[in-house]
């Protein structure tokens, strides 16, 4: 839907990031090091990046934090200020746990929430408490195979999709799907098998 605009907040990807990446690949080529074709084709990713954020869509080089202290930081409260009916996607490498309470407070503005939970074996209770507040309802889950599994063969990182039950009707029936779902879920790392999820009552 071209009427939907995307605003991305990411302090790790800027011009310096791309320059550093290209320099590293060029040096590897000059030294005749093995370089995968995908790495060589990364230059097209940069072109796609420029095109994607050319019209309407925005990339703001800011770090998402609980409380703003620096110019390059922004809180969820400020991100959602004057916003409504949004899809919020969060992948901030472990900092998601710091902002869960703010997300719950602003839940009425959010239609759909997609969030990647890192180190879930260390933060299980935080995730459980977030779910128990019932502001959002889980509609999908996928194990991220890039981070691997723990000793119980469970993923260390999961991607969860929530819907706002105040805005959409949801079924009370339990899902009978096997996860990952064929045709819907895709591997984060192609060379590794995807992680089959086990559920317990």
Model-derived features: where do they sit?
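Secondary-structure junction/capping motif
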Residues: 70-76
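SAM cofactor-binding core of SAM-dependent methyltransferases
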Residues: 1-70, 83, 117-119
């Amino acid at each position: 839907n071209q009427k939907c605009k995307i605003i991305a907040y990411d302090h790790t990807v800027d011009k310096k990031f791309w320059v550093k990446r290209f320099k590293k690949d060029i040096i590897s080529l000059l030294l005749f090091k093995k370089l995968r074709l995908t790495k060589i084709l990364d230059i097209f990713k940069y072109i796609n990046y420029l095109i994607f954020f050319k019209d309407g869509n925005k990339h703001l080089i800011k770090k998402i934090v609980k409380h703003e202290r620096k110019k390059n930081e922004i809180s969820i409260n400020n991100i959602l200020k004057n916003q409504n009916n949004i899809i919020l996607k969060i992948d901030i490498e472990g900092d998601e746990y710091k902002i869960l309470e703010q997300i719950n407070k602003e839940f009425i503005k959010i239609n759909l929430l997609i969030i990647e939970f890192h180190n879930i074996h260390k933060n299980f209770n935080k995730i459980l408490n977030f779910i128990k507040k019932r502001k959002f309802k889980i509609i999908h889950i996928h194990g991220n195979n890039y981070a691997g599994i723990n000793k119980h063969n469970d993923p260390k990182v999961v991607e969860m999709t929530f819907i706002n039950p105040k805005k959409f009707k949801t079924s009370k029936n339990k899902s009978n799907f096997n996860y990952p779902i064929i045709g819907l879920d895709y591997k984060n790392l192609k060379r590794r098998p995807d992680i089959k999820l086990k559920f317990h009552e």
